[in-house]
Amino acid sequence: MMEGFGVHTFRLVNGKGDARFVKFHWKPLLGLHSVVWDEAQKISGKDPDFHRRDLWEAIEHGAYPEWEFGLQVVEEKDEHKFGFDLLDPTKLIPEELVPVKRVGKMTLNRNPDSFFAETEQVAFHPGHLVSGIDFSNDPLLQGRLFSYTDTQLIRLGGPNFHEIPINRPIAPVHNNQRDGHMRQAINDRRTSYQPNSLSGGCPMQAKADLGGFVSYAEKLGGAKVRQRSQSFFDHFSQAALFWHSQSEPEQTHIVKAFRFELGKLEVPAIRERMIGMLTRVDLTLAKRVAQGLGLNMPDKTPILFNLSVPADGNAAQYQPEPNKREPGRSPALSMATTLKDGIKTRKVAILAGDGVNDADLVGMQKALREAGAEAKIVAPRLGMLTSAKGAQVYIDFSFLTSSSVLFDAVYIPGGDGSAQTLEKEADAVEFVKEAYKHCKTIAATGAGDRFLRTTCLERDGSDRENDRNTEDEGLIIGHDGDARAVASKFINAMAQHRHWARELKAQPA
């Protein structure tokens, strides 16, 4: 799942008119997880609707996604105590400095009946506020208050976009607005102006004590100029904070992402310039990226990083501020610290063929279901397969209609016939190898043990000298009849999401 958070700083205003700055957060109750880059690319080809389908199926099965609503509240007197501009939308407040206070919950408990009416026509707008919330002087937010209205005028056909059923407020609205394209409301009063006597003076402007909106009375002073605050030129301190807050695997993924993106540039000078910019974030990061691009570290960084300067501006005044502070760490910025206490909504691929061991299959399905996960049978063909005891088992996917990138973990049950079928199936071998490459949890019991070992460990299964090490790396191996014990270890390993230690080892091709 993903976190949600706004980039802008708003204000909370209480009944006495006292204001505090606030940043809003949505915290997923199942923790923060993601796919890796190679998976993301392959998912786009295998199932472009993967994430939407996953959300839909979870809701349909009653596993409702939940987020808790959190606030980071800052007193007005503390606006300048953080070393960065609180109104700069490119900055975040480390949760270690201002903890997120959770005050509510959102549950997605129903799928749309009509995607067009209920999702395509949604009009989000930062100016649609409830009582007690006001705007800050964030200049980007001020611009968006205009631009979002302008966008919906074109996107949804006119000024009455807020009257479309999905956008209509729950609280009743009374005003003097009439007509306009796509008008939904029908007004039965004679007047459309205020003051009036014909309609008893209604509707009339609501005062603050009646719930009307009143802008926060803030004292301001200064010259009216067209320029950014100097505090907005701190471009690197939080980039450094983010880099130093990541775990080793996350840092490696960031380096690879830079190597990929910059490797697509066809002008070497731009690559070199970007390496120079990364030195302002962290020298180690810059060196690792440069190594992957076949570049040497620059002898000196450019004097002028920012060349986007107004015609009458002084270029020196538009350069990023040097990062003079120690970057520090914020564990809240790393996915390595996320919640890892369950496997609800995870999808597990059970690879099987005719002759699959009944006890292994049924036992694992039961354990996964009780833990809140969903198990799917993947086989060389669709239809039904016959278990070792003659039971008919429905096949959810074939290897042609599925892929390991669409699952969170893989299980290979016992059964000599089933294991032999998988060993002869090139797509089955590729399925397991790819899951291993992406550091997913993989388990096997009985005859499935041999298939797992030869596929992932390049061993024939005759020795078990390193079983403990494989468990630490998310490979759970058991004997015939071990399904219950393996299931417990399998579920605990799945809760860790990925096993990044594998990335440090050479993997079979």
What residue spans do the PLM features occupy?
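Residues that flank catalytic or metal-binding motifs in active/ligand-binding sites
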Residues: G6-H8, V22, P65, R102, ...
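Hydrophobic cores of alpha-helical transmembrane segments in multi-pass integral membrane proteins
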Residues: H8-F10, G104, L351
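Extended, subdomain-level signal for the structured scaffold at the beginning of enzyme domains
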Residues: T252, K256-E272, M277-K437, R450-A509
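Short helix/loop capping segments that flank catalytic or ligand/cofactor-binding pockets
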Residues: R20-K23, L32-V35, E79-H80, S114-E118, ...
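Charged, compositionally biased interaction regions
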Residues: D49, R53, E57-S334, K340
